[in-house]
């Protein structure tokens, strides 16, 4: 009788372990430094975290960088880790534009969603995850401030990934 109980207990522990293992998010080797990103409908293929595209009839370039502010989570509920990070882009003028970018980890290739504009010359602070929401914190300027002023107003924006799109959540 004791042997039966021990065998049943071992069997149940193994089954529970297998179920737990397969219920956890699986890690996929997403390398956000070497992905294609969609910004304003255009593709920018980053290599080692950077892309340079010459602007026709100009000596300027569109330079796009991946920042080191990022977080990993299963944003689209497919049990595979995704990455949310910040992209910086200079289009040849005085501005440095910041975007929230998400790459889904469904396969070995990067599958990015359309990036969301955060601001011009803002000061990124962090990206967090809470209840599958992406929370981006950064400093910005007041509307009446000059672009030469340092950003000093704390901004916190929240996003969800739905149907392979970033959707902003406006807190009530």
Q: Can you describe what each PLM-predicted range is?
A:
Residues 3-52, 123-172:
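Acidic, small-residue rich beta-repeat scaffolds with periodic aromatic anchors
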Residues 60-69, 116-124:
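Repeat-based blade/solenoid architectures
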Residues 61, 90-94, 145-151:
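Short consensus segments that form the blades of beta-propeller domains
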Residues 69-77, 127-129:
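Structural signature of eukaryotic scaffold interfaces centered on beta-propeller domains
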Residues 71-73, 88-91, 141-144:
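Short beta-turn/strand-loop junction motif enriched in small, turn-promoting residues
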Residues 77-87, 134-135:
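Acidic/hydrophobic-patterned starts of short beta strands in beta-sheet-rich repeat architectures
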Residues 98-104:
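Short, surface-exposed beta-strand/strand-loop-strand elements in extracellular ectodomains
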Residues 111-120, 168-172:
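Beta-propeller fold detector
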């Amino acid at each position: 009788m004791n042997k039966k109980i021990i065998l049943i207990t071992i069997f149940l522990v193994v089954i529970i372990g297998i179920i737990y293992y397969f219920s956890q998010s699986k890690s996929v080797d997403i390398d956000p430094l070497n992905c294609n990103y969609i910004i304003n409908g255009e593709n920018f293929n980053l290599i080692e975290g950077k892309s340079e595209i010459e602007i026709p009839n100009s000596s300027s370039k569109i330079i796009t960088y991946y920042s080191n502010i990022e977080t990993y989570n299963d944003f689209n509920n497919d049990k595979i880790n995704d990455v949310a990070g910040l992209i910086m882009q200079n289009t040849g003028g005085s501005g440095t534009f910041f975007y929230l970018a998400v790459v889904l980890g469904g396969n070995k290739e990067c599958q990015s969603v359309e990036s969301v504009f955060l601001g011009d010359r803002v000061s990124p602070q962090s990206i967090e995850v809470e209840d599958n929401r992406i929370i981006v914190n950064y400093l910005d300027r007041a509307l009446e401030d000059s672009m030469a002023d340092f950003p000093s107003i704390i901004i916190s924006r929240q996003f969800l990934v739905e149907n392979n799109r970033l959707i902003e959540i406006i807190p009530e």
